């Protein structure tokens, strides 16, 4: 996993809550900073891909590890 500036643990939350929390966190971050999101909802894989495309942010990494999904999102 690459370096990141902030981490959001959305484990146990069902969509759309991980997306909404990520959006709120990203809004407080500066352009170019990276957010690491941890989620347990399998639907979050598609959701974060679509979220990045809709918002213009870059989904740098998306992987599953130990039953958790990890996303690195770079704020545009």
From Swiss-Prot:
<dbReference type="InterPro" id="IPR036868">
    <property type="entry name" value="TusA-like_sf"/>
</dbReference>
<dbReference type="InterPro" id="IPR001455">
    <property type="entry name" value="TusA-like"/>
</dbReference>
<comment type="pathway">
    <text>Energy metabolism; sulfur metabolism.</text>
</comment>
<comment type="subunit">
    <text>Mostly a monomer, a small portion forms homodimer via intermolecular disulfide bonds. Tightly interacts with DsrEFH.</text>
</comment>
<keyword id="KW-0963">Cytoplasm</keyword>
<comment type="similarity">
    <text>Belongs to the sulfur carrier protein TusA family.</text>
</comment>
<dbReference type="GO" id="GO:0006790">
    <property type="term" value="P:sulfur compound metabolic process"/>
</dbReference>
<keyword id="KW-1015">Disulfide bond</keyword>
<protein>
    <recommendedName>
        <fullName>Sulfur carrier protein TusA</fullName>
    </recommendedName>
</protein>
<dbReference type="Pfam" id="PF01206">
    <property type="entry name" value="TusA"/>
</dbReference>
<dbReference type="GO" id="GO:0005737">
    <property type="term" value="C:cytoplasm"/>
</dbReference>
<comment type="function">
    <text>Sulfur carrier protein involved in sulfur trafficking for oxidative dissimilatory sulfur metabolism. Component of a sulfur relay system that starts with the sulfur-mobilizing rhodanese-like protein Rhd_2599 (Alvin_2599), which transfers the sulfur from a low-molecular-weight thiol, maybe glutathione, to the TusA protein (Alvin_2600); TusA serves as the sulfur donor for DsrEFH, which persulfurates DsrC; persulfurated DsrC very probably serves as a direct substrate for reverse-acting sulfite reductase, DsrAB.</text>
</comment>
<feature type="active site" description="Cysteine persulfide intermediate">
    <location>
        <position position="15"/>
    </location>
</feature>
